[in-house]
C-alpha cells in the first residue's frame, strides 16, 4: 500500500520532502532501488491545481489548514470559479471538503480533522447542503470546548463521510471525551445548522421551540462582532497593552477589553486577557 496506493499533496515543499523520506525509510529493502515517489507525493496548491484526477480515490484523508477568509483575498476569484461552496466569507478549509468529494470514487471515504465552524456558520450552509444531499455521514467527533491543537484557536471536529447519497442512514456521534457514543439519523440534520444531540435532548429542544419564540423572530438587529481587517495588529495581550500605556498614558483611552466568542460561556463570560486597539470610535 505504501509503495503503490498512497498519494499526497502539500503546498509546502519541505513537508513533501519529509513525507518522501519517511516513506523511503519504511519501504526500503537491501539491494532494491528506492520507490519512485515524484509522481505520487507532490508539491502543489491542491485547491487550484490538483495534480490528480477526479473520481479516482478510494479514501481521502486530511487536516485542512484553518486560514481565515481575510487572508485569502488574492485567490477568492479563482475559488469562486472552481467551487460551488464558495461564499465571500468562507474560510479556506471549506473548499477542501468539496475538493475531497470531487476526488473520491463513488462509495469512497473522506476523513478530515479540522475546524467545526461550518457546522453552524452561515458560510457553511452550501457545504452542509452538499453533505446532506450527496454524502452519507459515517461518524462525527465534535470537539467543541476541548482544545485539540495547541496552536489552533478554532474548535475542531473529526468528520468521516462517504461519497454515497444518503438513504435513511444513521451515523455515530462520538463524545469529545472519546468515551461514549450514540446513533443519530442523518435526516435529523438540517442545512441551516448541524446540531449533534441525542434523541431525548433533541425532543426537549423541540418542545422548547414550540412553546417559545426563536431569537431570529424577535425585533432585534444581530450582526457579526468586530471586524478589524487584521487581528494580529489590533488585538493585543496584557503585556503589549501595558507596554503601549507605559509609552504614552493616552493610549489607555483607545485600548479596550475584548471578549471573543470563545470567552462567552453559558451563563457569563471568562475574560481571556485580550484587548482591542479601538481607533474607530476615537478620531
Language-model features: locations:
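Short, solvent-exposed loop/turn segments at the edges of secondary structure
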Residues: 1-2, 152-156, 272
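Conserved SAM-binding motif I beta-strand of class I
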Residues: 6-9
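Conserved SAM/SAH-binding beta-strand->alpha-helix loop
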Residues: 12
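Signature of N6-adenine DNA methyltransferases within the class I
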Residues: 16, 21-249
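Core structural elements
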Residues: 159, 262-263
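Contiguous C-terminal substrate-recognition/catalytic subdomains in enzyme active sites
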Residues: 269-283
Amino acid at each position: 500500500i505504501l509503495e503503490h496506493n498512497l498519494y499526497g499533496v502539500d503546498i509546502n515543499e519541505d513537508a513533501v520532502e519529509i513525507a518522501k523520506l519517511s516513506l523511503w525509510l519504511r519501504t526500503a529493502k537491501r539491494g532494491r532501488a528506492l520507490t519512485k515517489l515524484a509522481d505520487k507525493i507532490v508539491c502543489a496548491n491542491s485547491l487550484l491545481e490538483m495534480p490528480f484526477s477526479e473520481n479516482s480515490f478510494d479514501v481521502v484523508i486530511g487536516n485542512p489548514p484553518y486560514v481565515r477568509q481575510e487572508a485569502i483575498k488574492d485567490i477568492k476569484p479563482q475559488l469562486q470559479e472552481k467551487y460551488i461552496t464558495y461564499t465571500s466569507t468562507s474560510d479556506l478549509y471549506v473548499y477542501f471538503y468539496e475538493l475531497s468529494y470531487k476526488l473520491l470514487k463513488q462509495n469512497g471515504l473522506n476523513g478530515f480533522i479540522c475546524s467545526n465552524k461550518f457546522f453552524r456558520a452561515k458560510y457553511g450552509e452550501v457545504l452542509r447542503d452538499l453533505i446532506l444531499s450527496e454524502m452519507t455521514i459515517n461518524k462525527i467527533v465534535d470537539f467543541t470546548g476541548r482544545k485539540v491543537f495547541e496552536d489552533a484557536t478554532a474548535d475542531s471536529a473529526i468528520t468521516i463521510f462517504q461519497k454515497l447519497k444518503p438513504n435513511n442512514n444513521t451515523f455515530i456521534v462520538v463524545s469529545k471525551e472519546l468515551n461514549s457514543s450514540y446513533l443519530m439519523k442523518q435526516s435529523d440534520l438540517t442545512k441551516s445548522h448541524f446540531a449533534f444531540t441525542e434523541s431525548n435532548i433533541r425532543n426537549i429542544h423541540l418542545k422548547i421551540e414550540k412553546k417559545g419564540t426563536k431569537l431570529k423572530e424577535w425585533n432585534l438587529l444581530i450582526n457579526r462582532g468586530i471586524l478589524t481587517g487584521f487581528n494580529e495588529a489590533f488585538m493585543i495581550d496584557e503585556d503589549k497593552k501595558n507596554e503601549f500605556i507605559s509609552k504614552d498614558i493616552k493610549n489607555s483611552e483607545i485600548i479596550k477589553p475584548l471578549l471573543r466568542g470563545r470567552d462567552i460561556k453559558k451563563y457569563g463570560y471568562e475574560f481571556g486577557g485580550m484587548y482591542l486597539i479601538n481607533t474607530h470610535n476615537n478620531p
